[in-house]
Regions:
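Extracellular beta-strand/beta-solenoid scaffold signature
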Residues: 1, 21-48, 64-72, 92-106, ...
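Right-handed parallel beta-helix
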Residues: 3-16, 51-64, 76-91, 100, ...
Length: 237
């Protein structure tokens, strides 16, 4: 078990070279295919139960990793403040849409605020999977290669005062796996210019979704799709 972990005031960069290239997009190209670095930024993976407790990430930049920028599992107490996790999560084994800027699984008491989760190449800005007692506040989640924020099987969560824009999928996706998420509040967010719905959710119970500003999400006038259906979503890659 590991307790009281603090990482702050660092830049963690996975790129191979830092000199200016002729093509400004060449670095992104090398992270998408067989030339990718296959590296993860920061990974804290618990074996069973809450193996970690009291994790704090502050003033931290994690960029240019082909795998997830930051991955945390089985933790009790996570604080992420004033961080920038950008350009992480590419098309590497085990495949696209499985690597993200930030992914947290099987954890509780999570506070994420005043941070950026932008431009994941093939993944989401932020993924919360099987988590309890969480809050995401005053964050920018933009221009990611899949959904902005993906949540699955979470309990007692708040998403407030965030900018969620320009993502290739939905701004917010509530995914159903076996029971669905419940007691989720999504309020006072600006959700705009996402390729699919602003908010889409399946099998979520006791939600409080209101006072969000929607603008030009998807191809339909409808900006939200909240379904009581309990079914898995199959994505076409």
């Amino acid at each position: 078990d590991a307790k009281n972990i603090t990482i702050e005031n660092l830049v963690v960069d996975g790129s191979k070279e830092h000199q200016d290239a002729y093509d400004p997009n060449s670095g992104r190209f090398y992270r998408t295919g067989r030339y990718s670095n296959a590296l993860a930024g920061i990974s804290m993976r618990g074996e069973a139960g809450h193996a970690f407790s009291n994790i704090k990430l502050k003033n931290l930049t994690v960029i240019n990793f082909s795998r997830s920028g930051v991955y945390i599992s089985d933790a009790e107490g996570i604080e992420i403040h004033h961080c920038d996790f950008t350009e992480n999560g590419a098309h590497v084994v085990p495949g696209p849409r499985l690597q993200h800027n930030l992914m947290i699984q099987h954890s509780s008491n999570i506070m994420i605020k005043d941070s950026r989760f932008d431009t994941s190449i093939r993944g989401c800005g932020l993924v919360l999977d099987h988590c309890k007692s969480l809050k995401v506040e005053n964050c920018e989640i933009a221009r990611n290669g899949w959904h902005g924020l993906l949540m699955a099987e979470c309990h007692n969560g708040k998403i407030e005062n965030c900018l969620v824009e320009g993502n290739d999928g939905c701004g917010f996706m509530g995914e159903y796996l076996h029971d669905g998420s419940n007691l989720i509040q999504i309020r006072h967010n600006k959700i705009q210019y996402n390729n699919e719905y602003g908010i889409r959710a399946f099998g979520m119970k006791e939600t409080d979704i209101k006072d969000n500003l929607y603008r030009w999400n998807g191809k339909e006038k409808r900006q939200e799709w909240l379904s009581s259906e309990k079914k898995l979503q199959l994505e076409q890659l």
